[in-house]
């Protein structure tokens, strides 16, 4: 039996599908999931036929040096505004670097339909301007993400290795908290062993919201964005079959999305210009070697 996603989430998805050529809205959220790394392939980027325009698919294992590869891809294809994710994870630090790049580019992220954003892939997903995923076992539109704690690759039986594992978890916690990921979910992630997985529920996804709090406040300040209220109004209009009210709300949503999309395109152009000059986003904390996921 399929798990339910929120009714507001259904409304957002339906509205997005209606207007996907002119707006860029995603809903739901995720954290780490564990999969068999032996089956992973090197990270690849390609255009995604599902959206036909302005979308790229990132898939495979995340390895050291991939941030530069991703940056070169976006320099070559600056019109990409959607990043579809289907990755089994990989190097945590590299994933965070790519995530910071995604944040600077102000592009949207989505877990691929019948795919997954596993393990360290979460750091890429969470930095999307708008982000979409679904709860486990829900089939339709996007894929799920789960969570577990990050861990060292090939740890040694030494006090130094144990201290390094602790430092990895502390740095990850600080990073997630600085991005206002709910502490409840951070606690779940850090207490979940790396050989187990917690799949986010619809309630977890609802709690995370489709946009980071900082970016949501920018949209409110610049575009008077009242997304949540409008989506509730749209849902109510659909339930009442009030076509006049539905049309009114959809017009407001389109205007709002046009405004927020304009802000995102402006930020994207500025980031591309910096990338061309050789800039890459700095790592948000001191690098820790020998970590992975």
Labelled PLM ranges:
Residues 116-120:
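Short, solvent-exposed linear patches
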Residues 2-26:
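Bacterial N-terminal signal peptides that target proteins for export
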Residues 34-40:
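Sec/Tat signal peptide C-region and signal peptidase I cleavage site
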Residues 146-148:
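Histidine-centered active-site/metal-ligand motif
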Residues 25-34:
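Bacterial N-terminal signal peptides
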Residues 40-115, 130-141, 151-293:
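N-terminal organellar transit peptides
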Residues 122-130:
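Amphipathic, non-transmembrane alpha-helical segments in extracytoplasmic/periplasmic proteins
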């Amino acid at each position: 039996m399929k798990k339910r996603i929120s009714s507001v989430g259904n409304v957002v998805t339906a509205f997005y599908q209606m207007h996907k050529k002119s707006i860029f809205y995603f809903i739901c959220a995720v954290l780490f999931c564990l999969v068999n790394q032996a089956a992973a392939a090197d990270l690849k980027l390609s255009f995604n036929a599902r959206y036909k325009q302005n979308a790229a698919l990132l898939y495979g294992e995340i390895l050291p040096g991939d941030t530069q590869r991703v940056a070169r891809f976006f320099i070559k294809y600056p019109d990409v505004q959607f990043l579809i994710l289907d990755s089994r994870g990989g190097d945590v630090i590299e994933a965070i670097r790519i995530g910071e790049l995604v944040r600077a580019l102000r592009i949207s992220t989505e877990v691929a339909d019948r795919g997954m954003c596993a393990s360290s892939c979460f750091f890429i997903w969470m930095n999307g301007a708008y982000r979409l995923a679904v709860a486990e076992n829900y089939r339709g539109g996007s894929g799920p993400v789960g969570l577990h704690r990050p861990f060292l690759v090939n740890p040694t039986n030494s006090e130094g290795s144990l201290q390094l594992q602790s430092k990895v978890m502390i740095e990850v916690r600080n990073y997630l908290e600085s991005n206002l990921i709910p502490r409840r979910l951070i606690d779940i992630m850090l207490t979940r062993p790396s050989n187990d997985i917690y799949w986010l529920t619809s309630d977890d996804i609802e709690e995370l919201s489709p946009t980071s709090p900082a970016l949501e406040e920018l949209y409110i300040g610049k575009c008077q964005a009242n997304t949540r209220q409008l989506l509730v109004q749209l849902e109510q209009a659909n339930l009442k079959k009030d076509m006049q009210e539905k049309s009114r709300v959809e017009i407001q949503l389109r205007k709002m999305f046009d405004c927020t999309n304009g802000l995102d395109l402006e930020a994207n152009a500025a980031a591309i210009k910096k990338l061309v000059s050789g800039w890459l986003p700095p790592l948000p904390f001191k690098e820790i070697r020998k970590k992975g996921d």
